[in-house]
From Swiss-Prot:
Protein name: Zinc finger transcription factor ref-2
Keyword Transferase annotated: no
Organismal lineage: Eukaryota, Metazoa, Ecdysozoa, Nematoda, Chromadorea
Disordered, as annotated region: 225-270
A GO term from the CC aspect: cytoplasm
SUPFAM superfamilies: beta-beta-alpha zinc fingers
Amino acid sequence: MSIPANTIQKDKMMHSDYYTQSQGPTVEQQPEWQASVQPYSDPHAYSPSFYMNMSQVPHFLPAQVDPFIYPNTLGSYGGDKQVQCLWETNGQVCMHVCQNSGELSTHISSNHITHDSKFVCLWKGCDREFKMFKAKYKLVNHMRVHTGERPFLCDVCNKVFARSENLKIHKRIHSGEKPFQCTHNGCTKLFANSSDRKKHMHVHSSHKPYSCMYPDCGKTYTHPSSLRKHTKVHENEKKSQLSPEHDESSDSGNASIGTPTTDESLTFSPENIKRDQHLHTMHTFMDRPNPFMQMYQNQFSNPTYHMFMAKPDSY
């Protein structure tokens, strides 16, 4: 059975028209409202041409940012990142590129930290301000702060540490070892590290170094956990002060979100600030022009559209 030539031609034209429409209307075919709408552009999206020409625009001058920040990574997301050596000697920064933090530590130990040199950290921007270390290994351990190297791995939970002492203390969590005993007479409590024992010793003395930071409170405690429990009391008081205002606004039938309050103590609370930010965000979204909504409103108000709607009495 042969297909007529005009049928094939019409079929080709139909597919051609559909393909053209699927690519989107041209400028002449766009509705008037759509032609006036500017295409959306994300101001935070990366555009190579924008950043390359940014220095040529007068009001987009490069920001004065210190490039010698830790860590100075050159790689992309995922995997080991390339890092730069920022060791400074006689005003010259090394800038040697290493593939990872371990390679950077090896480079520093073999090239910059020698037995003949003084054990001083010359990393760009180091806050030690050229204070000397007593031994080379102490300087090597300090350099892990800048390089980010953590060579000591826990074989139980795979956590990594920069110092072997920290790994040793961490392993006591898994073993249950508590070698530090309270030295107070009659107290038999044991601790995994000396810092926890030091905090505990305040219980046996009148010294209370942890004080409440809330105004007009002045309470002091011997242990930070007691201070945290006390701080929650203040937080619950703040919430109870805000709850009557919330109930009053919800019962009024108004659903007024931004009801002003005369209590100055509640004006700058975190809850009020968060609620005010949500209010501004909601108004900004609602006031934003929506051309698609305008298109559907125009379509539904068109008399020709209602001619195709079924009448209720026709069923």
